[in-house]
Amino acid sequence: MAEVKQTEVNEKKAVETKAQRVERLKRSKNAWDHFDEIQQFARDGFDSIPPEWLGTYFRSWGIYTQGDGVGVVGGKNGEGKARPFFMVRIRIPNGLLRTEQVRTIATLAAKHGRGVADITVRQNIQLHWVTIESLPDVLQSLWNVGLTTTGACGDVARNITGCPLAGLDGQEIIDASPLALAIDRELGGNSEFYNLPRKFKISITGCRHWCSYPEINDIGLTATTRQRGGKHEVGFTLRVGGGLSTNPHLAVSLNAFIKPEQVISVVRGVAEIFRASEVLRQSREKARLKFLFLEHGWTAESFLAELQQRIGLSLDPGEREEIPADIHRDHVGVHDQKQPGLVYIGASVLRGRITPQQLHLAADLADRYADGHVRNTVMQNLLIVNVRKESAALVAAELTAAGLPVHASVFARGTIACTGLEFCKLALTETKSFARWLTRELEDRLPAFEEQLKLHITGCPNSCGQHWIADIGIEGKKIKQDGRMVDAYYFCVGGSVGQFASIARPVGYRCSAGTVPEAIERLLEGFNTRREGNENLRQFFNRHTNEELRALLAGSSVGPIERDLAFGPVPHGVEG
Protein backbone atom coordinates (compact mmCIF):
# COMPACT_ATOMS: atom_id res chain seq x y z
CA MET A 1 0.00 0.00 0.00
CA ALA A 2 2.85 2.41 0.86
CA GLU A 3 4.41 1.78 -2.54
CA VAL A 4 1.10 2.56 -4.27
CA LYS A 5 0.75 5.85 -2.37
CA GLN A 6 4.33 6.81 -3.19
CA THR A 7 3.66 6.06 -6.86
CA GLU A 8 0.61 8.33 -6.75
CA VAL A 9 2.69 11.11 -5.18
CA ASN A 10 5.39 10.70 -7.81
CA GLU A 11 2.82 10.77 -10.63
CA LYS A 12 1.21 13.88 -9.16
CA LYS A 13 4.58 15.63 -9.03
CA ALA A 14 5.40 14.50 -12.54
CA VAL A 15 2.42 16.34 -14.02
CA GLU A 16 2.99 19.56 -12.10
CA THR A 17 3.55 22.65 -14.16
CA LYS A 18 6.51 24.82 -13.30
CA ALA A 19 4.18 27.34 -11.68
CA GLN A 20 2.47 24.66 -9.59
CA ARG A 21 5.79 23.31 -8.42
CA VAL A 22 7.13 26.72 -7.41
CA GLU A 23 3.91 27.60 -5.61
CA ARG A 24 3.96 24.29 -3.73
CA LEU A 25 7.54 24.85 -2.62
CA LYS A 26 6.88 28.41 -1.49
CA ARG A 27 3.84 27.32 0.52
CA SER A 28 5.80 24.56 2.21
CA LYS A 29 8.67 26.68 3.52
CA ASN A 30 9.74 30.24 4.14
CA ALA A 31 13.43 29.99 3.32
CA TRP A 32 14.18 33.12 5.37
CA ASP A 33 13.62 30.97 8.46
CA HIS A 34 16.20 28.38 7.42
CA PHE A 35 19.64 29.97 7.42
CA ASP A 36 20.73 26.89 9.37
CA GLU A 37 20.23 24.84 6.20
CA ILE A 38 22.53 27.17 4.25
CA GLN A 39 25.15 26.71 6.98
CA GLN A 40 24.76 22.94 6.70
CA PHE A 41 25.15 23.06 2.92
CA ALA A 42 28.35 25.04 3.45
CA ARG A 43 29.70 22.28 5.66
CA ASP A 44 28.57 19.43 3.40
CA GLY A 45 29.42 20.97 0.02
CA PHE A 46 27.61 21.87 -3.18
CA ASP A 47 26.48 18.35 -4.03
CA SER A 48 24.45 18.22 -0.82
CA ILE A 49 22.12 21.02 -1.96
CA PRO A 50 18.70 19.72 -3.08
CA PRO A 51 17.14 21.02 -6.33
CA GLU A 52 14.41 22.96 -4.52
CA TRP A 53 17.04 25.13 -2.85
CA LEU A 54 19.01 25.66 -6.05
CA GLY A 55 15.92 26.56 -8.06
CA THR A 56 13.60 28.27 -5.59
CA TYR A 57 14.62 28.87 -2.01
CA PHE A 58 18.01 30.49 -2.61
CA ARG A 59 16.34 33.14 -4.74
CA SER A 60 14.49 34.73 -1.85
CA TRP A 61 17.90 35.06 -0.19
CA GLY A 62 19.14 37.08 -3.18
CA ILE A 63 21.14 34.17 -4.50
CA TYR A 64 21.08 32.53 -7.95
CA THR A 65 22.95 29.54 -9.25
CA GLN A 66 25.52 30.68 -11.76
CA GLY A 67 25.61 29.64 -15.40
CA ASP A 68 28.61 27.99 -16.98
CA GLY A 69 29.48 30.81 -19.36
CA VAL A 70 28.45 28.98 -22.51
CA GLY A 71 24.72 28.68 -21.98
CA VAL A 72 24.52 25.10 -20.76
CA VAL A 73 21.83 24.64 -18.14
CA GLY A 74 22.05 21.36 -16.30
CA GLY A 75 19.96 19.80 -13.57
CA LYS A 76 16.29 19.08 -13.23
CA ASN A 77 13.61 21.56 -14.34
CA GLY A 78 16.21 23.93 -15.73
CA GLU A 79 17.51 24.67 -12.25
CA GLY A 80 20.99 23.72 -13.22
CA LYS A 81 24.05 22.44 -11.45
CA ALA A 82 26.21 23.46 -14.37
CA ARG A 83 28.68 25.29 -12.13
CA PRO A 84 29.07 25.09 -8.34
CA PHE A 85 29.06 28.87 -7.93
CA PHE A 86 26.52 31.52 -7.03
CA MET A 87 25.63 35.07 -7.90
CA VAL A 88 24.89 37.03 -4.72
CA ARG A 89 22.83 40.21 -5.09
CA ILE A 90 23.21 42.83 -2.36
CA ARG A 91 20.10 44.85 -1.65
CA ILE A 92 20.87 48.60 -1.51
CA PRO A 93 17.68 50.66 -0.99
CA ASN A 94 17.73 53.92 -2.98
CA GLY A 95 21.34 53.09 -3.86
CA LEU A 96 22.57 54.60 -0.58
CA LEU A 97 25.89 53.33 0.79
CA ARG A 98 28.27 54.26 3.58
CA THR A 99 31.98 53.83 2.93
CA GLU A 100 32.32 50.99 5.43
CA GLN A 101 29.70 49.13 3.39
CA VAL A 102 31.52 49.89 0.14
CA ARG A 103 34.76 48.53 1.60
CA THR A 104 33.02 45.40 2.82
CA ILE A 105 31.61 44.75 -0.66
CA ALA A 106 35.04 45.35 -2.18
CA THR A 107 36.67 42.96 0.27
CA LEU A 108 34.08 40.26 -0.38
CA ALA A 109 34.43 40.67 -4.15
CA ALA A 110 38.19 40.20 -3.86
CA LYS A 111 38.05 37.37 -1.33
CA HIS A 112 35.11 35.36 -2.62
CA GLY A 113 34.15 36.77 -6.04
CA ARG A 114 37.33 36.64 -8.16
CA GLY A 115 37.45 40.43 -8.21
CA VAL A 116 34.09 40.89 -9.94
CA ALA A 117 31.27 43.21 -8.83
CA ASP A 118 28.41 44.55 -10.94
CA ILE A 119 26.17 47.55 -10.28
CA THR A 120 22.67 46.70 -11.45
CA VAL A 121 19.78 48.64 -12.98
CA ARG A 122 18.03 48.52 -9.58
CA GLN A 123 20.93 50.11 -7.67
CA ASN A 124 22.07 46.77 -6.24
CA ILE A 125 25.56 45.31 -6.41
CA GLN A 126 26.11 41.69 -7.47
CA LEU A 127 28.97 39.39 -6.61
CA HIS A 128 29.84 36.33 -8.68
CA TRP A 129 31.83 33.11 -8.27
CA VAL A 130 30.73 32.71 -4.65
CA THR A 131 30.99 29.10 -3.44
CA ILE A 132 28.58 27.46 -1.02
CA GLU A 133 31.44 27.16 1.46
CA SER A 134 31.91 30.96 1.36
CA LEU A 135 28.24 31.88 1.48
CA PRO A 136 27.76 32.10 5.28
CA ASP A 137 30.80 34.37 5.58
CA VAL A 138 29.53 36.60 2.77
CA LEU A 139 26.09 36.94 4.33
CA GLN A 140 27.41 37.51 7.86
CA SER A 141 29.92 40.11 6.67
CA LEU A 142 27.14 42.03 4.94
CA TRP A 143 24.90 41.85 8.01
CA ASN A 144 27.73 43.21 10.15
CA VAL A 145 27.63 46.51 8.23
CA GLY A 146 23.88 46.78 7.87
CA LEU A 147 23.52 45.23 4.41
CA THR A 148 21.53 42.21 3.32
CA THR A 149 20.77 40.06 0.31
CA THR A 150 17.33 39.09 1.62
CA GLY A 151 14.66 39.80 -0.97
CA ALA A 152 17.07 40.92 -3.68
CA CYS A 153 15.76 38.06 -5.85
CA GLY A 154 12.72 35.79 -5.80
CA ASP A 155 8.96 36.25 -5.61
CA VAL A 156 9.17 39.08 -3.11
CA ALA A 157 9.42 42.85 -2.95
CA ARG A 158 12.72 43.62 -4.64
CA ASN A 159 15.12 46.47 -3.89
CA ILE A 160 13.41 49.87 -3.58
CA THR A 161 14.79 52.27 -6.17
CA GLY A 162 14.86 56.03 -5.94
CA CYS A 163 16.64 59.17 -7.04
CA PRO A 164 20.36 58.94 -6.19
CA LEU A 165 20.33 62.70 -5.53
CA ALA A 166 17.65 62.49 -2.85
CA GLY A 167 18.29 65.30 -0.38
CA LEU A 168 20.93 66.88 -2.62
CA ASP A 169 19.03 68.10 -5.67
CA GLY A 170 18.08 71.76 -5.47
CA GLN A 171 15.07 71.19 -7.72
CA GLU A 172 13.59 68.18 -5.95
CA ILE A 173 10.06 68.41 -4.59
CA ILE A 174 10.83 66.30 -1.54
CA ASP A 175 13.62 64.10 -0.27
CA ALA A 176 11.88 60.75 -0.70
CA SER A 177 14.78 58.58 0.50
CA PRO A 178 13.38 58.27 4.06
CA LEU A 179 10.20 56.87 2.55
CA ALA A 180 12.21 54.51 0.33
CA LEU A 181 13.97 53.19 3.43
CA ALA A 182 10.65 52.96 5.28
CA ILE A 183 9.13 50.90 2.45
CA ASP A 184 12.20 48.68 2.51
CA ARG A 185 11.78 48.12 6.25
CA GLU A 186 8.07 47.39 5.77
CA LEU A 187 8.37 44.85 2.95
CA GLY A 188 11.99 43.70 2.85
CA GLY A 189 12.35 40.41 4.69
CA ASN A 190 8.74 40.64 5.91
CA SER A 191 7.29 37.12 6.10
CA GLU A 192 3.83 38.51 5.30
CA PHE A 193 5.10 39.12 1.78
CA TYR A 194 7.42 36.17 1.38
CA ASN A 195 5.16 34.36 -1.07
CA LEU A 196 4.09 36.76 -3.82
CA PRO A 197 3.08 35.49 -7.28
CA ARG A 198 6.27 36.89 -8.80
CA LYS A 199 8.85 39.63 -8.34
CA PHE A 200 7.48 42.96 -7.11
CA LYS A 201 9.35 46.16 -7.96
CA ILE A 202 8.86 49.53 -6.29
CA SER A 203 10.22 52.97 -7.14
CA ILE A 204 9.72 56.21 -5.22
CA THR A 205 11.27 59.53 -6.12
CA GLY A 206 10.95 63.11 -4.99
CA CYS A 207 12.84 64.53 -7.96
CA ARG A 208 11.35 66.21 -11.03
CA HIS A 209 13.19 63.99 -13.49
CA TRP A 210 11.89 60.54 -12.56
CA CYS A 211 15.35 59.07 -13.01
CA SER A 212 14.30 55.89 -11.18
CA TYR A 213 11.86 54.97 -13.97
CA PRO A 214 8.49 54.73 -12.19
CA GLU A 215 6.91 53.81 -15.53
CA ILE A 216 8.39 50.29 -15.47
CA ASN A 217 7.80 49.41 -11.82
CA ASP A 218 4.95 47.52 -10.20
CA ILE A 219 4.57 50.58 -7.99
CA GLY A 220 5.87 53.96 -9.12
CA LEU A 221 5.48 56.89 -6.73
CA THR A 222 6.44 60.34 -8.02
CA ALA A 223 6.33 63.53 -5.99
CA THR A 224 3.82 66.22 -6.87
CA THR A 225 2.27 69.28 -5.19
CA ARG A 226 -1.10 70.90 -4.68
CA GLN A 227 -2.67 73.95 -3.08
CA ARG A 228 -5.25 73.25 -0.38
CA GLY A 229 -6.78 75.94 1.82
CA GLY A 230 -4.03 78.34 0.91
CA LYS A 231 -1.38 75.81 1.87
CA HIS A 232 1.24 74.18 -0.32
CA GLU A 233 1.13 70.40 0.10
CA VAL A 234 3.49 67.72 -1.15
CA GLY A 235 2.31 64.25 -2.05
CA PHE A 236 2.77 61.52 -4.61
CA THR A 237 1.18 60.30 -7.80
CA LEU A 238 0.71 56.54 -7.95
CA ARG A 239 1.36 54.26 -10.91
CA VAL A 240 0.96 50.49 -10.86
CA GLY A 241 1.58 47.54 -13.14
CA GLY A 242 4.71 48.55 -15.02
CA GLY A 243 7.22 46.01 -16.26
CA LEU A 244 9.27 44.90 -19.27
CA SER A 245 10.35 41.33 -20.16
CA THR A 246 8.53 39.70 -23.11
CA ASN A 247 5.34 41.70 -22.56
CA PRO A 248 6.48 45.27 -21.90
CA HIS A 249 3.84 47.41 -20.23
CA LEU A 250 4.06 50.96 -18.93
CA ALA A 251 2.58 51.51 -15.49
CA VAL A 252 -1.02 52.73 -15.21
CA SER A 253 -1.60 56.06 -13.47
CA LEU A 254 -4.25 56.02 -10.75
CA ASN A 255 -6.37 59.08 -9.98
CA ALA A 256 -5.08 59.56 -6.45
CA PHE A 257 -3.02 62.02 -4.43
CA ILE A 258 -0.99 60.05 -1.90
CA LYS A 259 0.02 61.98 1.19
CA PRO A 260 3.46 61.09 2.59
CA GLU A 261 1.87 59.58 5.69
CA GLN A 262 -0.28 57.34 3.44
CA VAL A 263 2.59 55.92 1.41
CA ILE A 264 3.25 52.84 3.54
CA SER A 265 -0.45 51.91 3.73
CA VAL A 266 -0.82 52.33 -0.03
CA VAL A 267 2.28 50.28 -0.81
CA ARG A 268 1.13 47.53 1.53
CA GLY A 269 -2.32 47.63 -0.05
CA VAL A 270 -0.97 47.17 -3.57
CA ALA A 271 1.28 44.36 -2.35
CA GLU A 272 -1.73 42.69 -0.71
CA ILE A 273 -3.76 42.92 -3.93
CA PHE A 274 -0.86 41.27 -5.75
CA ARG A 275 -0.45 38.59 -3.08
CA ALA A 276 -4.17 37.74 -3.18
CA SER A 277 -4.32 37.43 -6.99
CA GLU A 278 -4.47 33.65 -7.36
CA VAL A 279 -5.11 34.03 -11.09
CA LEU A 280 -1.53 35.29 -11.43
CA ARG A 281 -0.11 32.14 -9.87
CA GLN A 282 -1.19 29.90 -12.75
CA SER A 283 1.70 30.75 -15.07
CA ARG A 284 5.21 31.95 -14.23
CA GLU A 285 5.31 33.81 -17.55
CA LYS A 286 2.16 35.80 -16.73
CA ALA A 287 2.47 36.32 -13.00
CA ARG A 288 3.52 39.98 -12.74
CA LEU A 289 1.05 42.60 -11.54
CA LYS A 290 0.81 44.08 -15.05
CA PHE A 291 -1.11 41.01 -16.25
CA LEU A 292 -4.13 42.08 -14.21
CA PHE A 293 -4.39 44.89 -16.77
CA LEU A 294 -3.09 43.00 -19.80
CA GLU A 295 -5.22 39.87 -19.51
CA HIS A 296 -7.68 39.98 -16.63
CA GLY A 297 -9.75 43.08 -17.32
CA TRP A 298 -8.54 45.34 -14.54
CA THR A 299 -8.59 49.09 -15.13
CA ALA A 300 -7.12 52.05 -13.30
CA GLU A 301 -10.56 52.69 -11.81
CA SER A 302 -11.16 49.13 -10.61
CA PHE A 303 -7.66 48.88 -9.17
CA LEU A 304 -8.07 52.14 -7.25
CA ALA A 305 -11.44 51.03 -5.91
CA GLU A 306 -9.99 47.72 -4.69
CA LEU A 307 -7.00 49.50 -3.17
CA GLN A 308 -9.12 51.98 -1.23
CA GLN A 309 -11.37 49.23 0.06
CA ARG A 310 -8.40 47.14 1.15
CA ILE A 311 -6.62 49.92 3.05
CA GLY A 312 -9.79 51.51 4.41
CA LEU A 313 -8.96 54.96 3.06
CA SER A 314 -10.66 57.27 0.59
CA LEU A 315 -7.72 58.75 -1.27
CA ASP A 316 -7.91 62.31 -2.56
CA PRO A 317 -8.22 62.71 -6.34
CA GLY A 318 -4.97 63.17 -8.21
CA GLU A 319 -3.51 66.52 -9.16
CA ARG A 320 -2.17 67.55 -12.52
CA GLU A 321 1.49 66.61 -12.49
CA GLU A 322 4.49 67.87 -14.40
CA ILE A 323 5.79 64.90 -16.34
CA PRO A 324 9.42 65.33 -17.42
CA ALA A 325 10.01 65.63 -21.15
CA ASP A 326 12.80 63.85 -23.02
CA ILE A 327 15.50 63.53 -20.41
CA HIS A 328 18.79 61.75 -20.06
CA ARG A 329 19.94 61.88 -16.48
CA ASP A 330 22.90 59.61 -15.89
CA HIS A 331 24.33 61.83 -13.11
CA VAL A 332 27.83 61.58 -14.60
CA GLY A 333 30.09 64.60 -14.12
CA VAL A 334 30.65 67.24 -11.45
CA HIS A 335 27.46 69.00 -10.35
CA ASP A 336 26.43 71.45 -7.65
CA GLN A 337 24.29 70.28 -4.78
CA LYS A 338 21.73 72.41 -3.00
CA GLN A 339 24.10 72.53 -0.04
CA PRO A 340 26.40 75.56 -0.53
CA GLY A 341 29.99 74.68 -1.32
CA LEU A 342 29.28 71.01 -2.02
CA VAL A 343 29.13 69.00 -5.24
CA TYR A 344 28.44 65.44 -6.23
CA ILE A 345 30.72 63.63 -8.65
CA GLY A 346 29.30 60.96 -10.91
CA ALA A 347 31.65 58.38 -12.38
CA SER A 348 30.76 56.37 -15.47
CA VAL A 349 31.01 52.66 -14.67
CA LEU A 350 31.00 51.08 -18.10
CA ARG A 351 28.45 48.19 -18.20
CA GLY A 352 28.24 48.44 -14.40
CA ARG A 353 31.34 46.32 -13.81
CA ILE A 354 33.56 47.62 -11.05
CA THR A 355 36.64 46.17 -9.36
CA PRO A 356 37.46 45.89 -5.66
CA GLN A 357 40.29 48.37 -6.17
CA GLN A 358 37.90 50.91 -7.70
CA LEU A 359 35.42 50.42 -4.86
CA HIS A 360 38.15 50.92 -2.26
CA LEU A 361 39.28 54.07 -4.05
CA ALA A 362 35.75 55.49 -4.14
CA ALA A 363 35.42 54.83 -0.41
CA ASP A 364 38.77 56.44 0.33
CA LEU A 365 37.91 59.54 -1.70
CA ALA A 366 34.49 59.80 -0.06
CA ASP A 367 36.09 59.70 3.39
CA ARG A 368 38.94 62.06 2.53
CA TYR A 369 37.09 64.73 0.57
CA ALA A 370 33.43 64.27 1.52
CA ASP A 371 31.37 62.81 4.36
CA GLY A 372 31.70 59.10 3.67
CA HIS A 373 28.72 58.42 1.43
CA VAL A 374 28.52 56.79 -2.01
CA ARG A 375 25.43 56.15 -4.15
CA ASN A 376 24.52 53.84 -7.04
CA THR A 377 22.28 54.77 -9.96
CA VAL A 378 19.87 52.79 -12.14
CA MET A 379 22.19 53.51 -15.07
CA GLN A 380 24.86 51.42 -13.34
CA ASN A 381 27.00 54.39 -12.32
CA LEU A 382 28.57 55.50 -9.04
CA LEU A 383 28.33 58.84 -7.23
CA ILE A 384 30.44 60.36 -4.48
CA VAL A 385 28.28 62.95 -2.76
CA ASN A 386 28.86 65.94 -0.48
CA VAL A 387 32.31 66.60 -1.93
CA ARG A 388 33.86 69.93 -1.03
CA LYS A 389 33.89 72.02 -4.18
CA GLU A 390 37.56 72.90 -3.88
CA SER A 391 38.40 69.18 -3.95
CA ALA A 392 36.24 68.29 -6.93
CA ALA A 393 38.96 68.44 -9.58
CA LEU A 394 41.26 66.21 -7.55
CA VAL A 395 38.55 63.63 -6.87
CA ALA A 396 37.50 63.61 -10.52
CA ALA A 397 41.09 63.13 -11.64
CA GLU A 398 41.67 60.20 -9.29
CA LEU A 399 38.47 58.48 -10.36
CA THR A 400 39.29 58.95 -14.03
CA ALA A 401 42.83 57.64 -13.56
CA ALA A 402 41.36 54.52 -11.97
CA GLY A 403 39.12 53.79 -14.97
CA LEU A 404 36.01 55.54 -13.64
CA PRO A 405 35.81 58.56 -15.95
CA VAL A 406 33.90 61.60 -14.78
CA HIS A 407 33.87 63.06 -18.29
CA ALA A 408 32.98 60.14 -20.55
CA SER A 409 31.70 59.76 -24.10
CA VAL A 410 27.98 59.60 -24.78
CA PHE A 411 28.44 55.93 -25.60
CA ALA A 412 30.15 55.09 -22.31
CA ARG A 413 27.59 57.12 -20.37
CA GLY A 414 24.56 55.69 -22.13
CA THR A 415 25.38 51.99 -22.43
CA ILE A 416 23.61 49.54 -20.12
CA ALA A 417 24.23 45.79 -20.12
CA CYS A 418 22.58 42.91 -18.29
CA THR A 419 24.60 40.09 -16.70
CA GLY A 420 24.65 38.06 -19.91
CA LEU A 421 25.92 34.61 -20.75
CA GLU A 422 29.01 34.94 -18.58
CA PHE A 423 26.99 34.23 -15.44
CA CYS A 424 23.27 34.06 -16.29
CA LYS A 425 21.71 30.70 -17.20
CA LEU A 426 18.90 32.34 -19.16
CA ALA A 427 21.10 34.48 -21.40
CA LEU A 428 21.66 33.66 -25.05
CA THR A 429 24.56 36.05 -25.62
CA GLU A 430 27.56 37.44 -23.77
CA THR A 431 26.89 41.09 -22.90
CA LYS A 432 29.45 42.60 -20.52
CA SER A 433 32.59 42.22 -22.62
CA PHE A 434 30.50 42.86 -25.72
CA ALA A 435 29.28 46.16 -24.23
CA ARG A 436 32.84 47.30 -23.55
CA TRP A 437 33.96 46.36 -27.07
CA LEU A 438 30.89 47.96 -28.67
CA THR A 439 31.40 51.19 -26.74
CA ARG A 440 35.04 51.45 -27.77
CA GLU A 441 34.14 50.71 -31.39
CA LEU A 442 31.50 53.44 -31.45
CA GLU A 443 33.85 55.92 -29.81
CA ASP A 444 36.39 55.23 -32.56
CA ARG A 445 33.84 55.30 -35.38
CA LEU A 446 31.86 58.33 -34.20
CA PRO A 447 34.24 60.46 -32.13
CA ALA A 448 32.25 63.66 -32.74
CA PHE A 449 28.82 62.23 -31.91
CA GLU A 450 27.42 64.20 -28.98
CA GLU A 451 23.69 63.50 -28.92
CA GLN A 452 22.80 61.87 -25.62
CA LEU A 453 21.50 58.37 -26.10
CA LYS A 454 20.57 55.28 -24.17
CA LEU A 455 22.05 52.14 -25.72
CA HIS A 456 20.78 49.11 -23.81
CA ILE A 457 22.00 45.55 -24.30
CA THR A 458 20.09 42.55 -23.04
CA GLY A 459 21.15 38.95 -23.53
CA CYS A 460 17.69 37.38 -23.75
CA PRO A 461 14.00 38.35 -24.10
CA ASN A 462 13.63 39.00 -20.35
CA SER A 463 14.94 42.55 -20.80
CA CYS A 464 17.03 42.83 -17.65
CA GLY A 465 19.04 45.32 -19.71
CA GLN A 466 15.82 47.34 -20.20
CA HIS A 467 16.13 47.53 -23.98
CA TRP A 468 12.43 48.40 -24.31
CA ILE A 469 12.99 51.92 -22.93
CA ALA A 470 16.21 52.68 -24.80
CA ASP A 471 16.84 54.94 -27.77
CA ILE A 472 18.55 51.92 -29.28
CA GLY A 473 17.85 48.57 -27.68
CA ILE A 474 19.39 45.31 -28.79
CA GLU A 475 18.26 41.87 -27.66
CA GLY A 476 20.52 38.85 -27.80
CA LYS A 477 19.81 35.78 -29.88
CA LYS A 478 21.65 33.06 -31.76
CA ILE A 479 21.77 32.79 -35.53
CA LYS A 480 23.47 30.34 -37.85
CA GLN A 481 26.42 31.80 -39.74
CA ASP A 482 28.73 29.73 -41.93
CA GLY A 483 27.29 26.56 -40.49
CA ARG A 484 27.68 27.46 -36.81
CA MET A 485 25.65 29.29 -34.20
CA VAL A 486 26.93 32.74 -33.27
CA ASP A 487 25.84 35.59 -31.02
CA ALA A 488 23.51 38.05 -32.71
CA TYR A 489 21.20 40.92 -31.81
CA TYR A 490 17.89 42.23 -33.02
CA PHE A 491 17.10 45.94 -32.91
CA CYS A 492 14.36 48.09 -31.44
CA VAL A 493 14.40 51.88 -31.33
CA GLY A 494 12.64 54.88 -29.85
CA GLY A 495 11.94 53.72 -26.31
CA SER A 496 11.35 56.48 -23.80
CA VAL A 497 10.15 57.35 -20.32
CA GLY A 498 8.59 60.53 -19.02
CA GLN A 499 6.21 62.73 -20.99
CA PHE A 500 6.67 60.73 -24.18
CA ALA A 501 6.88 57.33 -22.52
CA SER A 502 6.70 54.53 -25.03
CA ILE A 503 7.97 51.02 -25.58
CA ALA A 504 10.77 50.78 -28.12
CA ARG A 505 9.70 49.72 -31.60
CA PRO A 506 11.12 46.54 -33.14
CA VAL A 507 12.17 47.29 -36.71
CA GLY A 508 12.59 43.74 -38.01
CA TYR A 509 16.38 43.80 -38.32
CA ARG A 510 19.01 41.59 -36.77
CA CYS A 511 22.71 40.98 -37.36
CA SER A 512 25.62 39.08 -35.88
CA ALA A 513 27.25 40.58 -32.81
CA GLY A 514 30.40 41.33 -34.78
CA THR A 515 28.55 43.63 -37.18
CA VAL A 516 26.52 45.55 -34.58
CA PRO A 517 29.00 48.49 -34.42
CA GLU A 518 28.79 49.21 -38.14
CA ALA A 519 25.00 48.90 -38.08
CA ILE A 520 24.73 51.45 -35.26
CA GLU A 521 27.31 53.65 -36.97
CA ARG A 522 25.19 53.75 -40.13
CA LEU A 523 22.05 54.46 -38.09
CA LEU A 524 23.62 57.36 -36.19
CA GLU A 525 25.27 58.76 -39.30
CA GLY A 526 21.82 58.74 -40.86
CA PHE A 527 20.54 60.64 -37.83
CA ASN A 528 23.31 63.22 -38.23
CA THR A 529 22.58 63.83 -41.90
CA ARG A 530 18.78 63.56 -41.89
CA ARG A 531 17.71 65.09 -38.59
CA GLU A 532 15.42 68.09 -38.78
CA GLY A 533 16.30 71.03 -36.59
CA ASN A 534 17.07 69.99 -33.03
CA GLU A 535 15.08 66.77 -33.03
CA ASN A 536 16.39 64.06 -30.75
CA LEU A 537 16.77 60.38 -31.47
CA ARG A 538 13.26 59.51 -30.30
CA GLN A 539 11.74 62.11 -32.61
CA PHE A 540 13.97 61.02 -35.49
CA PHE A 541 13.01 57.37 -35.12
CA ASN A 542 9.32 58.25 -34.87
CA ARG A 543 9.56 60.18 -38.12
CA HIS A 544 11.02 57.25 -40.06
CA THR A 545 9.42 53.98 -41.09
CA ASN A 546 10.74 50.57 -40.17
CA GLU A 547 11.81 50.12 -43.79
CA GLU A 548 13.84 53.33 -43.71
CA LEU A 549 15.48 52.44 -40.41
CA ARG A 550 16.35 48.92 -41.59
CA ALA A 551 18.00 50.43 -44.64
CA LEU A 552 20.13 52.64 -42.41
CA LEU A 553 21.10 49.74 -40.19
CA ALA A 554 21.89 47.40 -43.09
CA GLY A 555 23.38 49.92 -45.48
CA SER A 556 20.83 49.00 -48.13
CA SER A 557 17.16 48.19 -48.44
CA VAL A 558 16.33 44.88 -46.76
CA GLY A 559 13.09 43.13 -45.98
CA PRO A 560 11.91 42.57 -42.43
CA ILE A 561 12.46 39.53 -40.28
CA GLU A 562 8.82 39.08 -39.35
CA ARG A 563 9.45 37.49 -35.96
CA ASP A 564 11.58 40.51 -35.03
CA LEU A 565 8.82 43.00 -35.80
CA ALA A 566 6.82 42.51 -32.61
CA PHE A 567 7.32 42.10 -28.91
CA GLY A 568 5.35 39.73 -26.76
CA PRO A 569 5.48 35.98 -26.29
CA VAL A 570 7.21 35.41 -29.63
CA PRO A 571 10.57 33.74 -28.88
CA HIS A 572 13.24 36.00 -30.34
CA GLY A 573 16.07 33.74 -29.24
CA VAL A 574 17.54 30.77 -31.04
CA GLU A 575 17.20 30.25 -34.75
CA GLY A 576 18.24 27.21 -36.75
Name each model-derived stretch.
Residues 2-576:
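Peripheral terminal and linker regions in Fe-S/redox and tRNA-modifying enzymes
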